[in-house]
From Swiss-Prot:
Residues binding L-glutamine, per UniProt: G46, E47, S48, R107, I138, R139
Catalytic reaction equation(s): aldehydo-D-ribose 5-phosphate + D-glyceraldehyde 3-phosphate + L-glutamine = pyridoxal 5'-phosphate + L-glutamate + phosphate + 3 H2O + H(+); L-glutamine + H2O = L-glutamate + NH4(+)
Segments traversing the membrane: none
Originating gene: pdxT
Signal peptide bounds: none
Disulfide bonds: none
UniProt xrefs under PANTHER family: PYRIDOXAL 5'-PHOSPHATE SYNTHASE SUBUNIT SNO, PYRIDOXAL 5'-PHOSPHATE SYNTHASE SUBUNIT SNO1-RELATED
Protein name: Pyridoxal 5'-phosphate synthase subunit PdxT
Pfam family, one: SNO
Coiled-coil intervals, chain numbering: none
InterPro entries: Class_I_gatase-like, PdxT/SNO, PdxT/SNO_CS
Keyword hit for Magnesium: no
GO molecular function, one term: pyridoxal 5'-phosphate synthase (glutamine hydrolysing) activity
Organism, scientific name: Corynebacterium glutamicum (strain R)
Subunit organization: In the presence of PdxS, forms a dodecamer of heterodimers. Only shows activity in the heterodimer.
Length: 200
């Protein structure tokens, strides 16, 4: 199984470490040819406006979007969630997204870097529940609204939606890769494995 990590900026190495610890073969994705033969891709956290600009600069945005539309499994964290969203409450000037995930997202919903925090979050999808996932919220977004094809899979005690699934897309506001809690990475890899088996 070959899975990619969009390696334009942000928390690339942490996701590579998680995936490789779980036995996946990984590839850094920077240009369109890096997408060839992937069975899944991670869009990591970082700075969503920089991610957008670099993806367009390296001509990877459009082929990536096309593959996701065609069903390529995606796991996105923090800025990755923002980058997939159809709508942003508070976009930066000129900011573009892939507009693939039917959600409204508020950037930096908890404030600045100083207001970053760690907590635990219960995550549920594909018939499984992962209690107490160790989650790092770093200038994190939240989902303020979502369409009928989107399922909320994680929320904070105050009701803020911090994880969603839409078909082949799983997106979280937080960073499990920063905490060493790799259960969601493993569950995502399991979903890819099931998809591959069905395709055989």
């Amino acid at each position: 199984m070959i899975v990619g990590v969009l390696a334009l900026q942000g928390g690339v190495e942490e996701h590579l470490t998680a995936l490789e610890a779980l036995g996946a073969t990984t590839r850094k994705v920077r240009v369109p040819k890096d997408l060839d033969g992937l069975e899944g891709i991670v869009i990591p956290g970082g700075e969503s406006t920089v991610l957008d600009k670099l993806a367009r600069t390296f001509d990877v945005a459009e082929p990536l979007a096309n593959l996701i539309r065609d069903g390529l499994p995606v796991f996105a964290t923090c800025a990755g969630l923002i980058y997939l969203a159809k709508h942003l409450d508070n976009p930066a000037r000129g900011q573009q997204t892939l507009e693939l995930l039917d959600v409204v997202v508020r950037r930096n919903a908890f404030g600045t870097q100083r207001e970053s925090f760690d907590t635990t979050v219960d995550v549920s999808f594909d018939g499984a529940t992962f209690p107490g996932v160790q989650a790092s919220f770093i200038r994190a977004p939240i989902v303020t609204a979502f369409g009928p094809t989107v399922e909320a899979i994680a929320a904070l005690n105050g009701g803020e939606v911090v994880g969603v699934r839409q078909g082949n897309i799983i997106a979280l506001s937080f960073h499990p890769e920063e905490t060493g809690d790799y259960r969601i990475h493993q569950a995502w890899l399991n979903l890819i494995g099931k998809r591959t088996e069905l395709a055989i």
